[in-house]
Amino acid sequence: MSVKWNEYYQKVAQQPHRPNVERAANLLTLDNKTAIDAGCGTGRDSQYLLSRGYTVHAFDAHQDAVETCLTRFEGNPHYSISHSCFSDFTYPACSLFIASASLFFCPSEHFAKVWQKINKALVPNGVFCGDLLGINDSWVEADTHPNICAFTKEQVEALFEGYEILYFHERDEDGTTAVGHTKHWHTFSVTAIKR
């Protein structure tokens, strides 16, 4: 585990769940409440979903995140976590797929196959809630984050053919990271129902 991820996890460990996750959970009309929390980090979104009666299958590529969640959710029969990356995870059927700022780190050479797996796992009328990195983001050319995947707006829209997009927000501005570093953000936040 690198120092930068440890610092990030310490900064976000006590933060509440993301508002877009709550919005996505409220959109779900299916009786089956099964979620995948992809790149779950410290489990803040998983915690919220469990409180709403979901069964959560989570994964993260960083062992420290997995260990944090194993401790946090110890004994919860509705929670499972895997030490996996996007390309290695075995995707169960789900009604809600959460990828909060994690698909950024799916290597571009694996993304097409990963996206197929996500689409196959998400049942009809299931909800996707996640973020994709835009091509103007400063991480695209940075050595600090090799193997990231970035998209144009048109490419993101094409990914969601067969979905009803309910929320689409493009952020293209200077800002800071959770640990206070300045950077240029270019992201697409999407909430969509699979049709």
Model-derived features: positions:
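Class I (Rossmann-like) S-adenosyl-L-methionine-dependent methyltransferase catalytic domain
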Residues: 1-30, 41-90, 109-113, 127-195
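Conserved acidic residues
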Residues: 33, 95
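Conserved beta-strand/loop positions that form the S-adenosyl-L-methionine
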Residues: 38
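A conserved beta-strand element that flanks and buttresses the S-adenosyl-L-methionine
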Residues: 98
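Short catalytic micro-motifs in class I SAM-dependent methyltransferases
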Residues: 101-102
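ABC ATPase nucleotide-binding domain "signature" loop
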Residues: 105
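A short glycine-rich, Lys/Arg-flanked "PGG" loop and its adjoining helix->strand segment in the class I
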Residues: 112-124
